Amino acid sequence: MTERPPSEAARSDPQLEGQDAAEARMAPPHLVLLNGVAKETSRAAPAEPPVIELGARSGAGGGPASGGGAARDLKGRDAVAAEARLRVPTTELCRPPGPAPAPAPASAPAELPGDGRMVQLSPPALAAPAGPGRALLYSLSQPLASLGSGFFGEPDAFPMFTNNNRVKRRPSPYEMEISDGPHTKVVRRIFTNSRERWRQQNVNGAFAELRKLIPTHPPDKKLSKNEILRLAMKYINFLAKLLNDQEEEGTQRAKPGKDPVVGAGGGGAGGGIPPEDLLQDVLSPNSSCGSSLDGAASPDSYTEEPTPKHTSRSLHPALLPAADGAGPR
């Protein structure tokens, strides 16, 4: 608002009458209240500002004594109070709990240009419990933040709970170490179980295949893993000895001065009997290998007893009739 000279303001303003003129004379220096607007004048001001009684507004004789400037003053104060009541204080949960700040902005508009007093307006009734309610919310949220689990943030944010002393002091089934969560333990346990199961299946499959290669008198005889290994070693040693005997007989038949009895037998590798049939007859229950396989394993079963070479060479002619006849296989 631009300022005007006193002479121009005097010409443009309407003349004050009655109580308005008296109140204008008692206004502060160089200020006149007209419709709630202060204007400059050259009149002198009284020593003290007037005190307006609130009860004079509703009195029966509220004529010239209570009208005019007093009514405008009361209207201005009512507007300021209504504006302060419309302001709703907001509660911010992100701030730490503390005493509620004093409503400083609400008291600023209470100062009027024509009056030296200040009116202290109290906040609305709903704003009073805002402070305790905020403190209650923070008191409830502090135990949740102190749990220190992976759902509330990184464990480094709570260094006082990273130690295992809390778990040792109050052990319970729902507490755990923060450094090693349940997800890591479950994954490790599943991986270990699957790896052990796969290894056991491979071992069982290998023993089953080895059991099929070992001949026994009842073909479906139940054998333990230890028995399967012992019989497999005996069977391998017997086959190696049989091959050595066949090679020796072949070399002796090729010599010119060979015994005719041994040559007539034809029990070498060059005979008419296939090697597969010979091996089956050797592993029959009547043979020495079959009886040793069905019998109990002795401590010295891992080593073969040394036998003379002529005994080994005479093994095959004795087995030939059993192969040609109807001997068991």
UniProtKB/Swiss-Prot annotation:
Residues 96-106 have a biased composition (Pro residues). Phosphorylated on serine residues. Phosphorylation of Ser-122 by MAPK is strongly stimulated by hypoxia. Ubiquitinated; subsequent to hypoxia-dependent phosphorylation of Ser-122, ubiquitination targets the protein for rapid degradation via the ubiquitin system. This process may be characteristic for microvascular endothelial cells, since it could not be observed in large vessel endothelial cells. The modification Phosphoserine is found at S12, S122, S172. The keyword Transcription regulation applies. GO terms for cellular component: chromatin; nucleoplasm; nucleus; protein-containing complex; transcription regulator complex. GO terms for biological process: angiogenesis; astrocyte fate commitment; basophil differentiation; cell fate commitment; central nervous system neuron differentiation; definitive hemopoiesis; embryonic hemopoiesis; erythrocyte differentiation. One of its GO terms (molecular function) is protein dimerization activity. Residues 317-329 have a biased composition (Low complexity). Residues 1-28, 40-78, 91-125, 247-329 are annotated as: Disordered. Residues 58-70, 263-273 have a biased composition (Gly residues). It is found in: Nucleus. Residues 187-239 form the bHLH domain. Keywords: Chromosomal rearrangement, Developmental protein, Differentiation, DNA-binding, Nucleus, Phosphoprotein, Proto-oncogene, Transcription, Transcription regulation, Ubl conjugation. Erythroid and myeloid cells. Implicated in the genesis of hemopoietic malignancies. It may play an important role in hemopoietic differentiation. Serves as a positive regulator of erythroid differentiation. Efficient DNA binding requires dimerization with another bHLH protein. Forms heterodimers with TCF3. Binds to the LIM domain containing protein LMO2 and to DRG1. Can assemble in a complex with LDB1 and LMO2. Component of a TAL-1 complex composed at least of CBFA2T3, LDB1, TAL1 and TCF3. Interacts with SBNO2; this interaction inhibits TAL1 occupancy of the DCSTAMP promoter, leading to the activation of the DCSTAMP promoter by the transcription factor MITF. The helix-loop-helix domain is necessary and sufficient for the interaction with DRG1. This is T-cell acute lymphocytic leukemia protein 1 homolog.
